[in-house]
Structure formats: structure tokens, C-alpha cells
Amino acid sequence: MTQKGIFRNTIGALTLTLSMGIIAETAAYADEGMWLPSLISERIGDMQSKGFRLSAEDIYSVNQASLKDAVVLFGRGCTGEVISAEGLLLTNHHCGYGQIQKHSSVEHDYLRDGFWAMSREEELPNKGLSVSFLEKMEDVTSVILEGYTPELTEAQRDSVVNVNSKQIIKEVTAEGKGLRATVESLYYGNQYFLFLYREYGDVRLVGAPPSSIGKFGGDTDNWMWPRHTGDFSIFRIYADKDNNPAEYSEDNVPYTPKRFFKISLGGVREGDFTFVYGFPGRTQEYIMSEGVRYVSEISDPAKIALRTMRLDTQKKYMSESQKVRIQYSSKNAGVANAWKKWQGEMKGINRLGTVAAKQEYEKRFAKWAEGPEYSTILPRLDSLYGALEPYTFAREYYSETAASVELCSFAGSVAKKLAGGDNEGAAALSEAFFKDYYLPIDKESFVATMSAFVKDVPVEFHPEYLKEELSKYGSVSNWADALFGESLFTDADKVAKLEAADTAAMYADPAVRFANEFRKWYVSDVYPYEKRLNREITLLYRDYMRGQMEFEPKKAFFPDANLTLRVAYGSISGYSPADGTYYKPQSTLEGIMEKDNPEIFDYDIPQRLRDIYAAKDYGQWAITGDNGKKTVPVCFIATNHTSGGNSGSPVINKDGNLIGLNFDRVWEGTMSDIEFDPEYCRNISLDIRYVLFTIDKLAGAEHLLKEMVFVK
């Protein structure tokens, strides 16, 4: 199979059917959709009718530089954009947070104070961080299913898909030079796309504001509007002297991009066209009512309660110690992010009546699908969801309780590495663990969450190990005293002295035993059953998805997000979250000063910003506020359909210029992973002018501004 053959037009009868759904007249709701860039020509008319001035080729092209060449997958879960001819890269502060933390210490607290490289020599390398540019995407459905016939079993179909996928990936990455590829299933396996990337592994930290700007509002404001968070960080991509990907080397030079974003200083106004280009992570737009009911009535409430326990414990100790605050800043942010999202998702689903609406849709579908091909799908799905529920519940509780115990996870990982002779890997794990570990937090969280596991997970799902330990110690609290008191993995010096020969002692350690026994229980008693049931559900969704497309031939179906590059477009728009309340789409520096409070950590801004505000020293970044006085724009909201993974995505105006970077959604609209509602769903973006203001006036890093190209 040649590369030329792989990239030929492979659209067969099945793909044509799907494309008819994709090409259809309008989306289900205005501004709903995460569209594949390679098919954006089918949406460009709608985009242009809403104000967009560029062409489909300007958005995505394999024949010339296009906007896609300025967008990267940052790490393995965020988006970034190139903003200069010298590889300068912009993403969110929370996307770069882990790198900022790794470079921080009590002596050099870059989380608290910020960091700015005033020369190329001061830019900090980040081992393990990479960015990936999409070279091309291609429908390869016919190639992937070559050799498949309806007579084959699902296992045989999987084999065909896997063999053909590996062959395609091998051929398209043969050149090397940082190429990597994936074959992704769309529409539950009705369609397959090849994504070819070029990955750069030398990405250096250039600048980050202090957390009092980059995380302003903290967990209090997370998912909320109005928002005033300066959520950005700056990196630079480096390459070898031929501009090819290379691991870190002092000989590397700044990457020269095919395309970078020009920066608009024109600002935003209600109704302006907006366009988000990024890598949304996961959506479930087409699941049936029973799947939504489990999320809103069982899963979200349970996970919220469990994470509340951990967050309360972390915050208590973080407020008492600067060292602990630094150690747990990133961990706390990670725990809180989904915690608040789940709350908004649950409320949004209930407010919209999504379960009832889907049930009504399913009744109409069932009436239409009275023939043999689709008539049994919904009853079978309903039955499978009922069988799946207890296993999913057990898995989610395991993930939020036993698997979240820091000591035990660490102990299990180190023991495994030492037993395999990987002393260097064990030492690296140990160094990273003890740098950011505080035992009282972990122990108190253990007692709270494991007590919840004992109470909430049905007894028939309890591991035998759990029953034995509770019988032995009488309570979770006593069990915690013994486990944390007796484990040698709480002592860095003892861990450093361990060798592979100590295998027996390691595996007898209570922390290692906890990790291994719970893992063994999950692997044997939960995972196989959940996997089998999910597999059966997915196979039915392949048919249900195809049936929905036939049922609604004029609806534009977009594939669920799967961390592949997508286009979402909409407009600048305020919204009304409650009766008598309307939120304007722009926030300003005035809002920061209204919230500023040195007594509240989330709202304690740098003194430098207070001084700038007092002097009204805003420079060219000033605008006239609603009160007629000068201020600085901070954030804005729009109707673009986004998800996790869109963090850091460029927000682009009608001329293709950068106006901001996406970093959040409003709390009332977080159910958009399941159902998009144009009245409530808003993505929150950082205004690029606040980024520039911060670089100029707070950081004094004018040299970075000189790299950028500005347009009015």
C-alpha cells in the first residue's frame, strides 16, 4: 500500500452517506459544532454569511501555508498557537502550569512571582514536553476497512482495522523527522480518519505571569462569568539548524513556522464573528437518554462529593504553609477543575430537561425505525446500560478513592520499577514525589474517601482485601494509622536504599499491598465486565449513529470530539443566566480592582498592578469603558462550541487574526459536552490585549512584543 494510494480519494458508499449528513444545510442549533478542518469547505458558506472573510483554503490546506500551521497540540491535552516568525508560542497558564511548577522552588517561586526570560539564554527547557503540528488529515475509511466483509465477526473486523491502521501509520511516518500518525474512529466506527503530525520536543518556557494574574479568581471563579483571569503562558519551539524536530540541545535554534498569527488590536464587540481552532477532548453529543441519566443523577453527584473531601483537606493545609501551597497548587487545580465542571454539567442537564428530551426523540426514532435494521437498537442499549451501571459506579469510585491515594500509587509504581531493575526510573519517581508530597493531606483524604467507598459501593463489589483490612483494624481511621505509620515509602531515605533484591519486603509493604490489591480487584472484578458491556454498547451506537443520520437527513452531524483538530465558530455574545440578569460579553480591569482583596488568596493581585491602575498607566492597551473612563480589556465570551482540550486555543476574528485565547466555559453551559444550548453555552477567552498589557506593563518584556506582528 503506497503513500500515494493512502491519500487518494477513498470515500466509498458508506462515507458518502456520512458526508451527506456532514454537508447538510444547517446545524441543529446556531453555533453548535466541532467541524473537521479538511471538510470546512462544506461550512464555509455559513461562516462567511456570519462575517468571516477568508476562504476554506485559508483555514486548512495541504498545498500551502494555512491557519492550521499556526496551531499546535500542546503536550497531550491542550492547544497552543504560534505568534511570531521565531517560534514564539502562546497557550494558557493552566496548560503550562506543570512546567512552571517544575521550575519553581521556595527560592525561585515562579508560581507566585511569575517568570520572564529576558534573553534566549534564559529560556527554560522542559523535558517531556512536546508540541505537534497537524500536517494533514484524510478520510481513509475505505483503506482501513479493506478486506472487511459483512460475514466477518467483530473481532475479525477489529483485526482488519488494526492491521490496516498500522500499515498506514508505518508508511506515512517512514520519513521520520518527527512524524507521528494516528488513525481515529469517527461516528462510533462508521468512518476513519488519518491524522499525520510533526512533533517538536524542544519547547522552552519564555514567560508566565504570577499566579495572582494567571490564576486570578482561582477555584472561586473557575467556570464562572464575569471572569478576570490572565490565563496565559509563553513558550518557544526550538528545532535543529534545518528546522526539523530535535530533542533539547544548546545547538538548536528557534523554529521558523510555516504560518503564525498576526495579532489584532481592534478588540471585540457584541455580534462580532469568532472562530476557535483547537483540539477539543471528548464529547458525547449522540448518547441516548439512559446514558445522560446516569451522568446527571448518579455519576456527577457522587464524584462531586468525593472531590469535595479532597479539596477541603488540601485547602486547609495549603492555607497554613507556603511550602505546602507550592507543593499542592497544581494538584489542587487538577482536582478542582472537573469538580466544578461536573456541578455545572449536572445543573445544565437538569435545567434543559435533556433526559426527557432525548426520551422523546427516542420515541420518534423508534416509530421511524420499525423495520428490522434499527428496531431493536434502543431496547438493547437500555438493557446494556442497566447492566453496565454498577460496574461503572465501582470504577469511578475506585478512581476517585483508592487510586487517588498518593502514597500508595507512588509505592506501587516504585516497587514495580525496582523489581524490573529500573533503579534510575525509581529514583526519578521518588525525587518528584517527595518534592510535592505532604503526608497529613494524603492521610486525611484517605480516611474521608475510603470511608465513602465502604459506605457507598455495594458490599458485593468490595474487594476481599478491603474486607480483611476492615476486619483487622475495625475502622478506616485505624487502618490509615497503620498503613501510613508502617510504610517505608513515607521516608525518602529508606526508599533511596531499596534495591531489586528487596522485592519481598517491598511487596509486603502496606502501601504497595494496598495499591496492588485494589488494582488486582479492579482488573479482575470490574474492568473486564465494564469493557465487555461498553464494547457492546459502542457496537450498537455504530448502528444507532447511522440510523440517526438516516432519520434526520437534513441535520448536520459533526463527529464527537476526540482530541483531534476542529473548527468551532460563533459570535461575541452576552447571556442571561437567570431571570433579571444579563452578562455583558466583555470584562475589564475595573472588575479586577473591584475583586482585589489582599485578605483573600484568589483575589490578591500584585502590588505592581495596583500601582499601574492608580496611575492609569495603560499605554496603547487602553480602551474607553462603559463609564467613559480608560480601562484595559481582560476577557470576553462567545458562542463557540468548545470542550476540554480547547484550553489555549486561538480565538480568531473575521480576518483570521488573533483576538484571544480560549480557556474556559461558563458554568451554566458545561453540559455542552452532551447537549449544546445557544442560550447558555459560552466559551470564555482571554482578550489578547490583556496579554500584551501584562507583557508590556507588568513584565517589562518589550522584546517579546517586538517579535509579534500587530494589525488594527
Where are these regions (language model features)?
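Terminal presequence/propeptide segments associated with secretion/organelle targeting
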Residues: 2, 6, 22-712
